[in-house]
Amino acid sequence: MKRVVITGFGIISSIGNNKKEVLNSLYNGISGITFSEEMKESGMRSQVWGNIKLENKKFFKKNKISRFMNNGSIYAFLSMEQAIKDANLQTKQYQKNPRIGIIAGSGGGFPKYHIQGIDAIRSNRGLNSVSPYIAIKAMNSGISACLSTLFKIYGVNYSISSACATSGHCIGNAFELIKFGKQDLIFAGGGEEVSWELAYEFDAMKALSSNFNKNPTKSSRVYDVNRDGFVISGGGGIIVIEELNCALSRSAHIYAEIIGYAATSDGKDMVVPSGDGAVRCMNLAKKQNKMLFIDYLNVHGTSTKIGDLIELEAIKKSFFHEKKPMISATKSMTGHALGVSGVHEIIYTLLMMKYNFIAPSINIETIEPSADNMNIVQKTFHKKIKTALSNSFGFGGTNVSLILKKY
């Protein structure tokens, strides 16, 4: 079986729109959460989000394909441009090559376009008032469809949609395809737009934070006793996953090797995690490398009352006979980017591995008793990270664990 490495990445997020900006935010514990006037005007309880701040959108007119692109696709497109440059890939190396593919998706979908179409029909303006591009803009697979067309990808081309584990599954699936020799290189990740049309669905569940609307940067507070729900976010992220010999043959810089991947199902509840599924997932990922010590664990931790505690208990069980790793929750800075959070957190972890630090879990004023003595990093901690594990979980009991080793 082949060895699989990461040779580049690109990111659009609430804490920065490139490697340099994101690194600065991570290292200094800077929150990307802001007040949302749109959520307030929509009558929502939660009025904070991790919005994306882009100064210009000239790229939107780059190609006729842009008519089919939603904001999530645009964020993923910008991320892929960065990733190609970061991986030092030349056009002739990835275009029209059947050994190079893309797997990228969205967890939340794009309901704003469904709403636009329905509003047009209900206003009696007729079917002719509905944009013919809505069907593509609204579908979850629009991201991989648009990117594969724009970048002339000839290999695999599809989206995975598994709630907040989406881009984690995209990465894991890409890893396995390369490991078993079916592809040489895959662009993996996803995109998620930030909109009240998506946020209200979670606000209706009372899953979002609402107690810190007047102090947005304090609203995402994983492991603090006063946490009251997650903060919705979004963005784009693409990583370049490559077969080791392929990467070496072109003298590529290698950030890390993917040495473990597992995906499991709770099979228990639609919204409340079982914990057992997470334990099995981490154990299966670790089982692929015996005598492996994990230096750092980037938790799924979203700032919900129940979910954070269940994941902590799962970590305790999974590492019961091992030394517990250092832990931090980057969503305390970024908010929850839903389907793109998995690839975002792999990128955050890659930056920490490269620059020898662990980003803090911010906003912990009074730590949850169950989180005490769990090696949770609350201030930037300087440490060489050789191996790291990242968790992504989603509604319906879907779980992903990925393990990276510094190359």
Curated annotation (Swiss-Prot):
Its EC number is 2.3.1.41. It is found in: Cytoplasm. It holds the Pfam family Ketoacyl-synt_C. The keyword Disulfide bond does not apply. The active site is at residues 164, 300, 336. One of its GO terms (cellular component) is cytosol. One of its GO terms (biological process) is fatty acid biosynthetic process. Its main location: cytoplasm. It is an enzyme of class 2 (transferase). Keywords: Acyltransferase, Cytoplasm, Fatty acid biosynthesis, Fatty acid metabolism, Lipid biosynthesis, Lipid metabolism, Transferase. Pathway: Lipid metabolism; fatty acid biosynthesis. The keyword Acetylation does not apply. It catalyses: a fatty acyl-[ACP] + malonyl-[ACP] + H(+) = a 3-oxoacyl-[ACP] + holo-[ACP] + CO2; (3Z)-decenoyl-[ACP] + malonyl-[ACP] + H(+) = 3-oxo-(5Z)-dodecenoyl-[ACP] + holo-[ACP] + CO2. Signal peptide: none annotated. GO terms for molecular function: 3-oxoacyl-[acyl-carrier-protein] synthase activity. Homodimer. Belongs to the thiolase-like superfamily. Beta-ketoacyl-ACP synthases family. This is 3-oxoacyl-[acyl-carrier-protein] synthase 1. The gene is fabB.
